Amino acid sequence: MTEAHNACCHPSGTAAGHHGAGKASTDMMDAVDRRLLDIIQTGFPIEPRPYAVLGETLGITECEALARVRALRERKVIRRLGANFDSWKLGFRSTLCAAKVPEDRIDAFVAEVNRHVNVTHNYLRNHEYNIWFTCICPSWEQVCSLLDGITERTGIPILNLPATKLYKIRVDFRMD
């Protein structure tokens, strides 16, 4: 890699500040950002230099493609950049979970739930069942063991709601 490439694509220091508490900022997006988002939602290049491929597709440099993705992440427009797998076809099992958590115990309960890498989503809702999360494990036995362990450590029962039929697994947010 050239010195210019390193300076552009691997700047020293840290990102500049946070823009709000988790709120995405889309007001500074141009047409290239929108095209970039359309492409990477479903067709992120599986290549040794994916940002070079993105840059070529968009008519920009590799460094600019990487810089744009970084900026979109910093502004929380991109929340996650990674692969999605069909966990069921890989033999994994997942479930939707709900719990009635007293308000004064929410932080402790959420901390216990979130410490498990098997938990993929966790939401606070305005409902009798106020904490909802999903978990995925290599087997049903491990799903049940994980949920039993959380209940044991927190004293809060968890409603286990495995899917009986899958209707939709993904969505693309078209930007054009």
From Swiss-Prot:
Keywords tagged on the record: Heme biosynthesis, Lyase
Region of interest (Disordered), ranges: 1-24
Swiss-Prot/TrEMBL GO biological process terms: heme biosynthetic process
InterPro entries documented for this protein: AsnC_trans_reg2, HTH-Siroheme_Decarb, NirdL-like_HTH, Siroheme_Decarboxylase, WH-like_DNA-bd_sf, WH_DNA-bd_sf
Record's compositionally biased regions (Low complexity): 12-24
GO molecular function: lyase activity
Name of the top EC class for this enzyme: lyase
Enzyme Commission numbers on file: 4.1.1.111
Protein task: Involved in siroheme-dependent heme b biosynthesis. Catalyzes the decarboxylation of siroheme into didecarboxysiroheme.
Subunit description: Forms a heterodimer composed of AhbA and AhbB. Also forms heterotetramers.
Miscellaneous comment as given in the Swiss-Prot or TrEMBL entry: Binds heme b, but reducing agents do not affect the activity of the enzyme.
Name assigned to this protein: Siroheme decarboxylase alpha subunit
The organism of origin for this protein: Nitratidesulfovibrio vulgaris (strain ATCC 29579 / DSM 644 / CCUG 34227 / NCIMB 8303 / VKM B-1760 / Hildenborough) (Desulfovibrio vulgaris)
